[in-house]
Amino acid sequence: MRIVADENIPLLDAFFAGFGEIRRLPGRSIDRAAVADADVLLVRSVTPVTREMLEGSPVRFVGTCTIGTDHLDLAYFQDAAIQWSSAPGCNARGVVDYVLGSLLTLAEIEGVDLRQRTYGVVGAGQVGGRLIAVLKALGWKVLVCDPPRQSAEGGDFVSLDEILQRCDVISLHTPLDKSGQSPTWHLLDEARLRQLRQGAWLINASRGAVVDNRALHDVMLEREDLQAVLDVWEGEPQVNVALADLCVIGTPHIAGYSLDGRQRGTAQIYQALCTFLDQPAAISLADLLPTPWLAQVSLDAATDPQWALNMLCRGVYDPRRDDADFRRSLTGDTASQRLAFDALRKHYPPRREIEGLKVHLEGESDTLTQLIRALGAVRV
């Protein structure tokens, strides 16, 4: 079996060497010629997989080690009887850690109490749903907008306009869809961006084009009260540098780049390929993940809960380092910036997740116990 794979997919050999020959390529370089003799194609979101790429090739399985599928021509896959799989939820915890770290940074800069803010989550899928659960477990007020789920389930959802009018913090977690009943391309266009309430914080860790980047730049120039955290950008790997300069935090599409999440995505595609080939999965991710450098922390029952929240979250992941690295990359000409964007992702340092962190609590505190549980950590 011949496998063509994005060279940045982790644990390629560990999971796929047993299937046959692996040819590694930069994700943006995978094209029709690269898959001309491939049976299996393994990609990330940077590789558009289209009819033009695959037609006439022997490829019968496509796996993307990401949660999104907007880079896959699923209609063609169905017509051509090509089996495919994504990795839903693989990086959800990493994105939640990113959002929490960003919120704590913003709160520190603005001098506000996160418990007093109203949060609007747009998109309640794998990532958004996880964030909603954590925010509610912390006891914070959350409004949710998800038109597809509202149509299918009913329930306690609100409109996007209500989110814009009522929420101090808006976090976007939608797929990118240019058509259908609920398109998300430029979901936040200039008109909607101008509806943001006074002092609002906008976080986008979904897809760059969910927000009209040019319009956001223009609105932020006019409204100094707004704050933005952007991990995704229209036109990646090119970035609107003028917009990045206006953001409190800017990063190169790494919100979900935890070591756990990236390797989890590879494991999910491995399991899907095993199912496609009708053979048992012989490799477990649990056997491959290294021990985290911060495996356990200790708290006293008298610890201030807000200090504990800050320590647990930013002790595991603090987005300010990624922001600093990103800003240093926004120099030189356009070509240099594009190369630097991809290099930051390719050489991203290992980062673990809060989930599973062991916390020893000396004494009893219902508030701290609830906090530990809300973050997905484990009291020991």
UniProtKB/Swiss-Prot annotation:
The active site is at R207, E236, H253. NAD(+) binds at Q126, V127, D146, T174, A205, S206, R207, D231, G256. SUPFAM superfamilies: Formate/glycerate dehydrogenase catalytic domain-like, NAD(P)-binding Rossmann-fold domains. One of its GO terms (biological process) is pyridoxine biosynthetic process. It is found in: Cytoplasm. It catalyses: 4-phospho-D-erythronate + NAD(+) = (R)-3-hydroxy-2-oxo-4-phosphooxybutanoate + NADH + H(+). InterPro entries: D-iso_2-hydroxyacid_DH_PdxB (IPR050418), D-isomer_2_OHA_DH_cat_dom (IPR006139), D-isomer_DH_CS (IPR029753), D-isomer_DH_NAD-bd (IPR006140), Erythronate-4-P_DHase (IPR020921), Erythronate-4-P_DHase_dimer (IPR024531), NAD(P)-bd_dom_sf (IPR036291), PdxB_dimer_sf (IPR038251). CDD domains: ErythrP_dh. Pfam families: 2-Hacid_dh (PF00389), 2-Hacid_dh_C (PF02826), DUF3410 (PF11890). Disulfide bonds: none annotated. Its EC number is 1.1.1.290. GO terms for cellular component: cytoplasm. Keywords: Cytoplasm, NAD, Oxidoreductase, Pyridoxine biosynthesis. Pathway: Cofactor biosynthesis; pyridoxine 5'-phosphate biosynthesis; pyridoxine 5'-phosphate from D-erythrose 4-phosphate: step 2/5. One of its GO terms (molecular function) is protein dimerization activity. It is an enzyme of class 1 (oxidoreductase). Its main location: cytoplasm. Catalyzes the oxidation of erythronate-4-phosphate to 3-hydroxy-2-oxo-4-phosphonooxybutanoate. Belongs to the D-isomer specific 2-hydroxyacid dehydrogenase family. PdxB subfamily. HAMAP family: PdxB. This is Erythronate-4-phosphate dehydrogenase. It comes from Pseudomonas syringae pv. tomato (strain ATCC BAA-871 / DC3000).
